[in-house]
Swiss-Prot record:
The lineage of its organism: Eukaryota, Viridiplantae, Streptophyta, Embryophyta, Tracheophyta. Residues 488-761 form the Protein kinase domain. Residues 427-834 are cytoplasmic. InterPro entries: ANXUR1/2-like (IPR045272), Kinase-like_dom_sf (IPR011009), Malectin-like_Carb-bd_dom (IPR024788), Prot_kinase_dom (IPR000719), Protein_kinase_ATP_BS (IPR017441), Ser-Thr/Tyr_kinase_cat_dom (IPR001245), Ser/Thr_kinase_AS (IPR008271). It comes from Arabidopsis thaliana. Residues 29-405 are extracellular. GO terms for molecular function: ATP binding; protein serine/threonine kinase activity; transmembrane receptor protein tyrosine kinase activity. This is Probable receptor-like protein kinase At2g23200. ATP binds at I494, G495, K496, G497, G498, F499, G500, Y501, V502, K516.
Length: 834
């Protein structure tokens, strides 16, 4: 009751504060951005020209010392008879390594644009070859150029660079006896609300910027001076799969998470779009998607920002929601229905490593058959630059990051507002709505040939289900399911996800159960449904959730499990008001889950079973905190005569084995990697991926390894564990997790080895606990007379003190606690990662 009252008080406080402060926040978020007059250089000229809404100053006519260039060995060409824009009529030529230097006014993210033109007919210009690099606290290889590869149209190469020094230099280096050239340069600071995720390293080279469904937008019509090209039909795999739509309505910039501002993209982008075009000859009961295919560098990391604004729907309801796919593997929910008004612009950010095909596909897909929801307004795609000067593409980074953009409200930045935002964050975490951006979802919307644009799949019927031939004796009548769930009463709903919904139920014999019901008629999850039944029907283990039965009557897909009283491991680590688990309890839970996975990996008559979706939400706890691994819908059987399995990538983002992502080869070691991420969750009590954290902290495993290299692991530990962990126990536990997270599978331990190591960690902890108990007893016995100091047992192997128990190190270095769910259900919960 006290908790309920507290929740109501919090809700009332939030409501009042939102009403008071929202006008200021909204004004701050949507205020008009004015591009700063930093540096606009007209190279090779002594005169100023106006272009793209800015005045470009001649590089020989600068009245300040803020811009300088290497004058030795340079040459100038001035062709005023050209019909090209005026900034392209002059060019500065370098025959030796040369540079432009800028004295910046501020650090942080900056736009850098280099303008090139080959309108001059000189032979040495047409054969010029040179490279461009930049330095501002770190070096960046920007681009290698050869004008002979360009058209006669002037080209602008745009970069987003993080400036770490006020001294910024752009270097031009001709190849051998060739030369370098430049027509104009722009350097200016980006707006504060332009957030780039740390997963991209914040140093980017723009390769595509499209006004989808609309005309070309010139720099004069963009507050940031960008050029938006129309998405020609060349990008669409099937030209008739989409139609252009446009609107005269002014975009409603509302501010907030993932919401766009007037500087995110021009109004014109949000007034036009391409929408699904379901032709009259489409068969009834089909899922549909539309795909844009882009030529990119192979095996290279890309940052993609996708723009949306619902100018299509008449009503804000779930019928307008659809899926966004990246390269056919990763799915994220796009929910226009969650926007407060129609025509409210928002965006999704993605970081993706391209495969070896040289193509990167972006798709929108329907959620339900016979629906044509789905649209796209704009797209920006940028290559990631490394700080060391080479392209950023390494095997350990072969993963997709789905990031929620954030518009920063600077005008109302007070302590009260920060408190409000934090409470709103907790409120969001408590709500039933899931965050699909956090956990990537695997689904292949495309046909087997690359670049496909449509997947027309009839809704499956289950009359020929292979389960009927297994004679499992696990079928439960649908009438019993209805009775157990009180006709699927929403009051009994305890979880939902990509497959369907989970209900707490009482079976006719009085047994508690968790009933998972697939989304009726969606045609999704059939294979997962059958796989889970086939896997669970052949295994029984103390640390694996048992399947009680299933039902497939009336095209239903219903699974019935034993009821796990204490819910998921995740709920006991973060995101709820449950009491914190002790370090000993956490170790015992890890050992139990490891034993369950080891049992799966132990070859049976048909082969080992690879779980393929190990995560903290798939480890459940019974009333005695006994851990059991759950959710086998993605599991695969691995025969002993196969070295590995080559399959499409499935799983949950944040837990995916990088080698599996790179090669599509699945082994038991993929489960080991995911379990290593779970070990980090257990120790640091935070999600594998949390887009609400600062960019460098979003990915748990990467952040932990960074902190380990800096010797700051103790600063990010779960505060509730401070004073509990014995030094050697912590050290050994981190060693196990690090081994599990090795880049290559053959470097990782088996689950059997992990069990042994975890049991050793538990022994280390228990020895310390017993020693401390003995010391307390000795002190108590001697308290009747003069106090006798306890005799400490010291050895070379074990420390008598936790590294967090004494002195300043025991202080809680966190500024907040994570308490975000108002109600905890005991069940089998489904995440949206399917």
């Amino acid at each position: 009751m006290e908790n309920f009252c507290f929740q109501d008080s919090v809700s009332l406080f939030i409501t009042i504060m939102v009403l008071v402060l929202l006008p200021r926040l909204s004004l701050s978020d949507t205020s008009t951005y004015t591009r700063p007059e930093n540096f606009y250089v007209n190279c090779g000229s002594d005169s100023n020209v106006f272009y793209g809404g800015q005045t470009f100053v001649g590089d020989t006519n600068s009245s300040t010392n803020s811009v300088s260039f290497t004058n030795k060995g340079t040459e100038v060409i001035n062709d005023q008879s050209s019909v090209a824009p005026e900034i392209y009529r002059t060019v500065r030529i370098f025959r030796h390594p040369s540079s432009y230097k800028f004295k910046l006014d501020s650090l942080g993210l900056h736009f850098v644009r280099l303008h090139f033109s080959v309108v001059f007919s000189r032979a040495d210009l047409l054969t010029a070859r040179f490279t461009v690099s930049a330095t501002s606290g770190s070096n960046h290889h920007l681009k290698s150029f050869s004008p002979q590869n360009l058209t006669n149209t002037p080209r602008v190469e745009e970069f987003l660079l993080m400036m770490n020094s006020l001294e910024f230099e752009i270097r031009f280096v001709p190849d051998h006896s060739s030369l370098a050239l430049i027509n104009a340069i722009e350097v200016f600071s980006a707006p504060d609300d332009l957030e780039i995720p740390s997963a991209s390293d914040k140093n980017l080279h723009t390769i595509y910027r499209l006004n989808v469904g609309g005309e070309k937008i010139t720099p004069d019509n963009d507050t940031l001076g960008r050029t938006w090209l129309p998405d020609d039909d060349d990008f669409l795999y099937r030209k008739d799969s989409a139609r252009n739509i446009n609107s005269t309505q002014t975009p409603n910039y509302v501010g907030g998470l993932s919401s766009a501002t007037d500087s995110t993209a021009p109004d014109f982008v949000y007034k036009t779009a391409k929408a699904m075009n379901r032709s009259s000859n489409e068969q009834v009961g089909m899922l549909m998607n539309v795909t844009w295919s882009f030529k990119v560098k192979s095996n290279h990391r890309h940052f993609i920002r996708i723009h949306f604004s619902d100018i299509l729907s008449n009503l804000s309801n779930s019928d307008s929601d659809f899926y966004l796919f990246v390269n056919g593997y990763w799915r994220v929910d796009v929910k226009p229905s969650e926007q407060p008004r129609l025509a409210s612009p928002f965006f999704k950010d993605v970081v993706n490593v391209s495969d070896g095909s040289g193509l990167l596909n972006i798709s929108i897909g329907t959620k339900e058959a016979n629906k044509d929801a789905g649209f796209l307004n704009g797209l920006e795609m940028m290559e990631v630059l490394s700080k060391s000067g080479s392209d950023y593409s390494n095997r350990s980074s072969s993963r997709v990051h789905i990031i929620t953009g954030c518009a920063v409200a600077a005008a109302a930045a007070s302590a009260l507002v920060f408190s409000l935002l934090f409470m709103v964050f907790l409120k969001r975490r408590r709500s039933k709505k899931t965050k699909p951006e956090v956990e990537g979802t695997v689904w292949s919307p495309l046909p087997l040939h690359r670049g496909g644009s449509s997947d027309n799949r009839p809704i499956s019927q289950y009359h020929n289900s292979p389960l009927r031939n297994l004679h499992l004796g696990l079928t439960i009548p649908f009438t019993d399911i209805l009775s157990a769930t009180n006709n699927f009463d929403e009051q009994l709903l305890i979880g939902k996800g990509g497959f369907g919904y989970v209900y707490k139920a009482i079976l006719p014999d009085g047994t508690k159960a968790a009933i998972k019901r697939g989304k009726t008629g969606s045609g999704q999850g059939i294979l997962e449904f059958q796989t889970e039944i086939q896997v669970l029907s052949r295994i029984r283990h103390r640390h694996l959730v048992s399947l009680t039965g299933y039902c497939e009557e009336n095209s239903e897909m219903i699974l019935v499990y034993e009821f796990m009283e204490k819910g998921t491991l995740k709920e006991h680590l973060y995101g709820s008001n449950l009491p914190s688990l002790t370090w000993k309890q956490r170790l015992e839970i890890c050992i139990g889950a490891a034993r369950g996975l080891d049992y799966l990996h132990s070859s049976g008559s048909e082969g080992a079973i690879i779980h393929r979706d190990v995560k903290s939400t798939n480890i459940l706890l019974d009333e005695h905190n006994i851990a059991k691994v759950a959710d086998f819908g993605l599991s695969k059987i691995h025969n002993q005569d196969e070295s590995n399995i080559s399959i499409n990538i499935k799983g949950t983002f944040g837990y995916l084995d990088p080698e599996y992502l790179q090669t599509h080869k699945l082994t038991e070691k993929s489960d080991v990697y995911a379990f290593g991420v779970v070990l980090l969750e257990v120790l640091f009590a935070r999600p594998a991926i949390d887009p609400y954290l600062p960019h460098e902290e979003v990915n748990l495993s990467e952040w932990v390894m960074f902190c380990k290299s800096k010797g700051t692991i103790d600063e990010i530990l779960d505060p509730s564990l401070i004073g509990q962990i014995e030094t050697n126990s912590l050290k050994k536990f981190m060693e196990i997790a690090e081994k599990c997270l090795k880049e290559y599978g053959d470097e990782r331990p088996s689950m059997r080895d992990v069990i042994w190591d975890l049991e050793y960690v538990l022994q280390l902890q228990m020895m310390t606990n017993r020693r401390e108990a003995h010391e307390e007893d000795s002190t108590a016995i001697n308290s009747g007379g003069s106090l006798v100091a306890p005799r400490l047992m010291v050895s070379d192997s074990f420390s008598t003190n936790s590294i967090f128990q004494n002195g300043d190190e025991s202080k809680n270095r966190f500024g907040f606690t994570d308490s975000s769910e108002t109600r905890v259900f005991s069940q089998l919960k489904i995440s949206d990662a399917r």
